[in-house]
């Protein structure tokens, strides 16, 4: 319906341009939206307020001219001017009921469209280092990324979901060396485990797996492993005035780097055994965790596979004049593209930087023919956006193809108090822990109920409560309530048939019923707006509002009554609410239970 109204408004604009009321080059950037207040009609346009300056007249005066030039629109009973110059459109009664036919015809497809059918989009998300289990912060990125991808698919886009596996960096070497040191410990070697190594028990489990398979084949003298390694950091017993540790001596970074170098030299090819065992153990754990959370990927892309692409990317930048040498390092001229400073891409020792890998990865993405790239990063990567976009432009591509969405941190609350997010050893509360406590549905829902760049205070008590204050429970309960109502109707021998019930739709004459019909009709627009804005919370809020309308109506008015025609009409309305709730919950990755 909004398409027909918008076409009529466009026609009116063309007429007024021909008459000289509006400039011929005026671009109509107005919005046509569904009204929130039923007294204001079904749709409202701000076109007169947008165009008033160009027309040189007051918005209400322009609105009158637009109405005069507006062609007749089928199923619109009237259009009127309101407030400072809004144009409100009122649907006739038959058109309001048409949404019931549309939902029943489209079922699971209702709300889906082909609006973004021309787009091939890659959504890269989570991409956590495979060095430990996913924590609750990663969980938010997982839920958000999966739901954004779902929404884009629902609007017709071809979407690939990708996880970038950081399997070639220093953190993996720290994990591999941590595993080797635990391996030596488990085989009776005495050593002081480094403070900057990975401390979790899972490292011992990986090491034990290597022992079970290969025994003591990789044992080397501990003295040689620690030979010429700089001293590990030593801390004072007391914290400083700000609660931070006070360094007395040593350097934890140089210490672990020395252990990595010695382990690699002593083990030779055997070092890869520890590297790969640790990588696969953690990556398998991450894959299982995400799959259990309903988050899946088309591609798990290995950073280690990028070596040739790094050379290609740097050669491209060099040929285009955007690399230079200084102090033995190779630098990228990112300041020429608005970055705050130039960036090193290759160090004097010949090692390329993580940034060089990221440039190569985005070159690889662009060469795969995507129309749009969506990267979902943690908020701490904010400063990284400008340099990546600079590299894309410098290689001759359009950085506007890349959208970077930042995901803020998550705080957990229980009993009105913030939950300690990490232990003394630095182990964060895991996604698996959260899912075990509140369930997948609550986690998936509450993770996306705020804009991604906004901090989330996750109330664990609320997430498991059975009350209307718990939005996901309230929505699911509306769906289950309708299922129970239909079962009750069937148990009494009531014969419900959609086409017959449709003939009695005019009995849905209450304001509450008209409001529900309007809310149902708004769903496709909500999905499209949420997809284009990368804002899943719009769908979540819509479902909350629809559930509230249904519960309020159900509590005040009997659906199953002695009035057969009214019963049929209200059952028809209910099953349409049920369908839309189910469709919306599916996009959010939340179940629609039939009983609660």
UniProtKB/Swiss-Prot annotation:
One Pfam family of this chain: tRNA-synt_1d
One Gene Ontology term, aspect cellular component: cytoplasm
SUPFAM superfamilies (UniProt xref): Anticodon-binding domain of a subclass of class I aminoacyl-tRNA synthetases (SSF47323), Arginyl-tRNA synthetase (ArgRS), N-terminal 'additional' domain (SSF55190), Nucleotidylyl transferase (SSF52374)
Keyword presence, Aminoacyl-tRNA synthetase: yes
Record EC number: 6.1.1.19
SMART domains: Arg_tRNA_synt_N (SM01016), DALR_1 (SM00836)
Major subcellular site: cytoplasm
Stored HAMAP family: Arg_tRNA_synth
NCBIfam families: argS
Entry protein name: Arginine--tRNA ligase
Gene: argS
């Amino acid at each position: 319906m909004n398409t027909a109204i918008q076409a009529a408004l466009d026609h009116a604009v063309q007429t007024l341009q021909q008459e000289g009321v509006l400039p011929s080059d005026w671009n109509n950037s107005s919005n046509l939206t569904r009204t929130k207040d039923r007294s204001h009609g079904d749709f409202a346009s701000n076109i007169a307020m947008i165009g008033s300056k160009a027309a040189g007249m007051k918005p209400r005066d322009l609105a009158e001219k637009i109405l005069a030039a507006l062609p007749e629109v089928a199923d619109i009973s009237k259009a009127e001017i309101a407030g400072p110059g809004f144009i409100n459109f009122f649907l006739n009664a038959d058109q309001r009921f048409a949404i019931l036919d549309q939902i029943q015809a489209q079922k699971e497809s209702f709300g889906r469209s082909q609006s973004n059918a021309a787009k091939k989009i890659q959504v890269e998300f989570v991409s956590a280092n495979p060095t430990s289990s996913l924590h609750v912060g990663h969980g938010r990125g997982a839920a958000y990324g999966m739901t954004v991808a779902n929404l884009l698919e629902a609007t017709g886009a071809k979407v690939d979901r990708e996880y970038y596996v950081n399997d070639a960096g220093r953190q993996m070497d720290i994990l591999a060396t941590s595993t080797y040191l635990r391996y030596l410990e488990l085989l009776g070697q005495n050593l002081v485990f480094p403070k900057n190594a990975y401390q979790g028990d899972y490292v011992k489990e990986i090491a034990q797996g290597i022992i079970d398979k290969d025994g003591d084949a990789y044992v080397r003298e501990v003295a040689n492993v620690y030979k010429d390694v700089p001293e590990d950091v030593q801390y004072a017993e007391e914290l400083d005035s700000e609660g931070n540790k006070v360094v007395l001596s040593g350097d934890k970074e140089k210490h672990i780097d020395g252990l990595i170098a010695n382990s690699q030299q002593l083990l030779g090819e055997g070092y890869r055994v520890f590297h790969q065992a640790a990588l696969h153990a953690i990556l398998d754990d991450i894959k299982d965790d995400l799959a259990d959370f309903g988050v899946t990927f088309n591609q798990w892309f290995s950073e280690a596979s990028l070596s040739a692409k790094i050379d290609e990317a740097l050669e491209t930048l060099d040929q285009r004049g955007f690399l230079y040498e200084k102090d033995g390092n190779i630098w990228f001229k990112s300041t020429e593209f608005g970055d705050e400073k130039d960036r090193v891409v290759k160090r004097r020792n010949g090692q390329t930087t993580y940034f060089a890998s990221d440039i190569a990865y985005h070159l690889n993405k662009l060469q795969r023919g995507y129309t749009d790239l969506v990267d979902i990063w943690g908020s701490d990567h904010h400063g990284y956006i400008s340099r990546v976009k600079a590299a894309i432009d410098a290689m001759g591509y359009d950085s506007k193809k890349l959208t970077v969405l930042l995901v803020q941190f998550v705080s957990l609350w229980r009993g009105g108090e913030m939950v300690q997010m990490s232990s003394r050893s630095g182990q964060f509360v895991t996604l698996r822990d959260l899912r075990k406590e509140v369930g997948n549905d609550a986690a998936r829902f509450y993770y996306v109920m705020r804009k991604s760049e906004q901090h989330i205070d996750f109330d664990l008590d609320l997430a498991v409560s059975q009350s209307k204050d718990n939005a996901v429970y309230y929505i699911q309960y509306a769906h289950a309530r309708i299922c129970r109502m239909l079962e009750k109707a069937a148990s009494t021998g009531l014969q419900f048939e959609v086409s017959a019930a449709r003939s009695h739709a005019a009995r849905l004459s209450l304001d509450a019923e008209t409001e529900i019909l309007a809310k149902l009709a708004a769903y496709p627009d909500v999905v499209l707006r949420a997809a284009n804005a990368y804002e899943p919370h719009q769908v979540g809020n819509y479902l909350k509002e629809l559930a509230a309308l249904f519960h309020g109506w159900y509590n005040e008015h009997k659906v199953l009554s002695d009035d057969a025609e009214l019963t049929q009409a209200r059952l028809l309305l209910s099953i349409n609410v049920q369908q839309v709730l189910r469709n919306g919950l599916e996009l959010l990755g939340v179940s629609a239970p039939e009983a609660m």
